[in-house]
Swiss-Prot record:
Residues 23-97 are annotated as: Disordered. Sequence repeats lie at residues 30-31, 33-34, 36-37, 38-39, 40-41, 42-43, 44-45, 46-47, 48-49, 50-51, 52-53, 54-55, 56-57, 58-59, 60-61, 62-63, 64-65, 66-67, 68-69, 70-71, 72-73, 74-75, 76-77, 78-79. The keyword Cytoplasm applies. The gene is per. This is Period circadian protein. Forms a heterodimer with timeless (TIM); the complex then translocates into the nucleus.
């Protein structure tokens, strides 16, 4: 704000009498000015980086046990005859093999 005026004092004399008189001026304070207004803008940038590492380890073991069992059995029979001698029986299959051979008496007597 503006400053007030300064006061002054003084003495003066008159022609007929010597008279001291004090005059005081009272200063009046000035009023303050208004504050200014302001605006502001700001920008900001930022970057961030990060790295991460990880390790996964694991072991696994397993055992599988199994038994497969089976029985195959069968009977193959066959007959064979021949004028020149008995033929072989039919071949046996897996498992038990039974061979039959049938010959006639006429062949046995020759």
């Amino acid at each position: 704000g503006g400053s007030g005026g300064s006061g002054s004092s003084g003495n003066f004399t008159t022609a007929s009498n010597i008279h001291m008189s004090s005059v005081t001026n009272t200063s009046i304070a000035g009023t303050g000015g208004t504050g200014g207004t302001g605006t502001g803008t700001g920008t900001g940038t930022g970057t961030g980086t990060g790295t991460g590492t990880g390790t996964d380890t694991g072991t696994g073991t397993g055992t599988r046990n199994g038994t497969n069992s089976g029985t195959n059995s069968g009977t193959r029979t066959g007959t064979a005859s021949s004028y020149r001698g008995g033929g072989g029986g039919a071949g046996g299959g897996g498992g038990v093999t039974i061979q039959h051979l049938t010959l006639t008496e006429s062949l046995l007597n020759k």
